[in-house]
Design a protein with these regions (language model features):
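N-terminal catalytic or cofactor-binding beta/alpha core of small enzyme domains
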Residues: 1-111, 117-127
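Catalytic cores of processing enzymes, dominated by hydrolases/peptidases
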Residues: 120-176
């Protein structure tokens, strides 16, 4: 469930959602940090779930705290980031995926981008990260298959290396 930092009503309808998954390493987390800091995203709240591990970090500007599941929005580009920095509690992944799926459907996002690492190594070089971090597009329609990636949200955690080849890099999200 989305918890806003302010009392104003926030609608995600017709915006795109960006989130990441990573089996090992933190190149995807680094990519999200680059996206946020280089594209004027602002923190608008967080995703509350009992399934998420607790974590608190300083914001990049050092002026506020950020939680596991923080939401960031770039209104001009109609992009929203869900930053799952602390991970999901052990044995609660299925429940979390169900909660997240329901939230995404209820929020009426127009597109969903899953950022996943194609490398198991930690990479901190910006140019290398741009080559290793791929974007996967998901549809809420289980019958729609886009670029032979995944059919629906629950399949996001079953991506093979073959499906990762030749996909969009994170920089391509910001080409106009």
């Amino acid at each position: 469930m989305f918890k806003s930092k302010t009392s104003e009503k926030i609608s995600f309808e017709n915006t795109s959602l960006i989130l990441f998954f990573s089996g090992k390493g933190n190149s995807t987390s680094f990519a999200l940090s680059l996206l946020r800091s280089n594209n004027n995203f602002k923190n608008i709240g967080y995703f509350y779930s009992e399934c998420l591990s607790s974590s608190v970090n300083y914001s990049s500007d050092g002026k506020s705290l950020e939680f596991n599941g923080s939401f960031y929005i770039n209104e001009s580009k109609k992009l929203t980031i869900l930053d799952l920095t602390g991970g999901v509690k052990s044995r609660e992944l299925n429940d979390f995926v169900d909660e997240l799926t329901k939230f995404i459907k209820d929020s009426k996002f127009s597109k969903i981008y899953i950022i996943g690492s194609s490398s198991k190594d930690n990479v901190f070089d910006v140019d290398l990260v741009s080559k290793l971090v791929n974007i996967y597009y998901l549809s809420n329609d289980p019958n729609e298959k886009i670029n032979c990636n995944m059919k629906n949200i629950k399949e996001a955690f079953k991506v093979t290396d073959e499906e990762r080849k030749g996909k969009t890099y994170y920089r391509d999200l910001f080409k106009n």
